[in-house]
């Protein structure tokens, strides 16, 4: 099971851990006879438990699960490193190293940092800070990329000052298909009219030309999709809409709002 930073902030780390355990058990195709818990008794009902303090040192099953958990987490942090390269997640994997804390002080916390964690609370960016430093569009791309990770995408590229991606903001892979995502970040209180309008035809053609050249340059083959996305920033949590467009013979064949 995977529990993200917002759920940890809402529930606390212990309850979030229990939730991840329940998610993992719920995905099993066979009901286990017993659940081995590394530590004290967990809030898991309907299953017999065996609690083992320092279980990763005493149980091969728990040790193997710990390795899988660490490898999975490290892979996620490498994905987040593409989205937030300034924090060096690929190097320290999000742990509380000196370098990590220095970057938080210098850059302000990112959306994936736990807001309830005391060192983070002193370095949360305000909307005024984001606007003053011209980070609104970048934040929109980052939030959309984080959303794609949560629903199972592998992030390949994200458009920032150092990326070669131009017309497309995010390139990802999902269920074997290459996904090109265009992100439109909207501040709700400043654009109340026509906020539902889609990207115009000229821009779509320019985007398709970019995708066609990218596919040719990379000598890619297979299925491709274009996500035209909108992320609305305002009071409360961001609102995300993604319009899924299949690409066939360099033309848009289908439009479907899928998130």
Identify the function of each model-found stretch.
Residues 1-154, 259:
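RNase H-like, Mg2+-dependent phosphodiesterase core
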Residues 49, 93, 170, 226-228:
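A structural signal for short, well-ordered beta-strand segments
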Residues 52, 173, 231-233:
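A generic structural motif
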Residues 158-159, 163, 184-241:
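Catalytic cores of nucleic-acid endonucleases
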Residues 230-259:
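Short, low-complexity, polybasic intrinsically disordered segments
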């Amino acid at each position: 099971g995977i529990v993200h930073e917002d759920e940890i902030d809402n529930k606390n780390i212990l309850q979030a851990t229990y939730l991840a355990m329940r998610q993992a058990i719920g995905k099993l195709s066979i009901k286990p006879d017993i659940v081995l818990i590394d530590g004290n008794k967990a809030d898991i009902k309907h299953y017999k438990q065996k609690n083992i303090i320092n279980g990763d040192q005493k149980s091969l099953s728990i040790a193997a699960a710990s390795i899988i958990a660490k490898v999975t987490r490290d892979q996620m942090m490498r994905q987040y490193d593409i989205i937030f390269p300034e924090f060096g997640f690929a190097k320290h994997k999000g742990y509380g190293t000196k370098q990590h804390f220095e970057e938080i002080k210098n850059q302000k916390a990112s959306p994936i940092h736990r807001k309830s964690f005391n060192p983070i609370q002193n370095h949360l960016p305000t909307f005024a800070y984001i606007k003053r430093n011209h980070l609104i569009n970048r934040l929109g791309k980052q939030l959309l990329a984080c959303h794609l990770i949560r629903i199972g995408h592998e992030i390949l590229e994200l458009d920032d000052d150092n990326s070669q991606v131009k017309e497309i903001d995010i390139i990802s892979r999902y269920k074997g298909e290459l996904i090109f995502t265009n992100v439109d970040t909207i501040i709700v209180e400043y654009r109340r009219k026509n906020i539902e309008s889609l990207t115009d035809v000229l821009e779509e053609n320019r985007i398709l030309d970019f995708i066609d050249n990218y596919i040719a340059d990379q000598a890619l083959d297979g299925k491709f999709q274009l996500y035209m996305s909108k992320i609305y920033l305002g009071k409360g949590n961001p609102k995300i809409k993604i319009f899924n467009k299949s690409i066939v013979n360099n033309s848009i064949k289908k439009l479907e709002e899928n998130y």
